[in-house]
Design a protein with these regions (language model features):
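Structural signature of alpha-solenoid helical repeat junctions
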Residues: 128-131, 135, 189, 210-213, ...
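Hydrophobic-face positions in mid-chain alpha helices that act as interaction patches
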Residues: 43, 215, 233, 237-317
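Inward-facing hydrophobic residues that define packing positions of alpha-helical scaffold repeats
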Residues: 107-110, 190, 197, 242
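Membrane-proximal, proline-rich intrinsically disordered regions
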Residues: 20-67, 242, 306-308
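Short coil/linker segments at helix-helix boundaries
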Residues: 123, 127-132, 153-191
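Conserved, well-structured interaction surfaces
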Residues: 80-154, 184, 202-205
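Sec-dependent bacterial lipoprotein signal peptides
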Residues: 1-18
Length: 321
């Protein structure tokens, strides 16, 4: 009996000590000495790439397209997206608030990544520091890109003659989740965008090729500069940026090439294509509204029944003349 009691006491003591250790240093927490490693820097970088995949899919495309009459609602839509289609969006609408929240949550993650990489820098080897310099450059680019995307939805169209008076958006540059930032002007917003692009170009120097570009390259920054210059009415610069990429990324000119691009992800047009695998499909929003179909066993074909289709006026813009 005495041996049994002693064994029980020993087990209870061991269990108590183990529980205490887990309370002090739980297995799911990151230990302070592990937070300043290359692995963690890669982790916060990867988290931002996941955010970007979400922002570049699903409703972030279909809702604005519905609102500006690029898409028409089909009979089988079940009124999905009807408020956008009928121009009945309000500031309290779920689509509007979720877009705002998603953009600024991504900004928070970007600024956290920059702050953490700065804190970890002195603990890294010289080779690791070079990689982190590139990662930080990516973060500066994504900050500029996300704010431009948000401005397209929440600001007036940029007018060079009025930008100093047009309302911009808060442009957070530090990881301060509770900060209350002023909107500023649209001119100031794009000054910040330009400053972040300059920082990105200092370290993101890999040129890129049309195959398997799942991380940011110099060419992707150039492509964004072309889009940005067009938006800012800098037409000569927009043309120059775009022309500098034509030779490396020629447009697909055949039906077979177009099919390979959409079915096999093989194309000469791809400047940057964020990686999505079967195991990471949950990190992107669905494009099912464009692709809904059902299998008809009697006829042996798929019945295509999209929620939306491109408007006739928009299709005419894309057809050869």
């Amino acid at each position: 009996m005495k041996k049994i009691i002693n064994s029980i006491l020993a087990f209870v003591t061991l269990f108590s000590v183990t529980s205490c250790d887990l309370d002090m240093d739980p297995e799911t927490a990151i230990r302070p000495e592990d937070a300043y490693t290359m692995e963690y820097c890669e982790g916060v970088r990867g988290y931002v790439y996941v955010d970007l995949k979400a922002l570049l899919s699903g409703g972030f495309y279909s809702t604005p397209d519905l609102y500006v009459d690029v898409l028409n609602v089909c009979i089988g839509s079940g009124n999905q997206g009807i408020y956008s289609f009928n121009w009945r969006l309000y500031p309290t609408d779920q689509d509007v608030t979720s877009f705002w929240s998603s953009y600024y949550t991504t900004m928070m993650h970007i600024n956290y990544a920059i702050r953490h990489m700065d804190a970890a820098y002195e603990y890294l080897t010289p080779d690791e520091q070079k990689k982190v310099d590139v990662y930080k450059g990516e973060m500066y680019f994504f900050r500029a890109y996300v704010m431009h995307r948000a401005a397209l939805l929440f600001c007036e169209d940029y007018d060079p003659d009025k930008a100093a008076d047009q309302l911009g958006l808060p442009y957070p540059k530090e990881w301060e989740p509770e900060a209350k930032l002023a909107r500023g002007t649209l001119a100031k917003l794009y000054e910040n965008v330009e400053a972040d692009l300059v920082e990105a170009e200092k370290t993101v120097t890999a040129q890129g090729t049309p195959t398997d570009q799942i991380y940011l390259t110099k060419d992707a920054i150039t492509a964004f500069r072309a889009e940005l210059a067009l938006h800012l009415h800098q037409y000569t610069e927009a043309s120059q940026y775009a022309q500098s990429l034509y030779g490396t990324y020629p447009l697909v000119t055949t039906a077979e090439g177009l099919e390979r691009m959409w079915r096999e992800d093989t194309s000469t047009e791809n400047i940057l294509q964020l990686e999505v695998l079967r195991t990471t499909m949950t990190t992107v929003n669905s494009f099912g509204s464009y692709l809904n179909s059902s299998w008809e066993p009697n006829s042996g074909v798929y019945f295509y029944a999209p929620t939306y289709i491109p408007a006739v006026s928009y299709r005419h813009l894309t057809l050869p003349t």
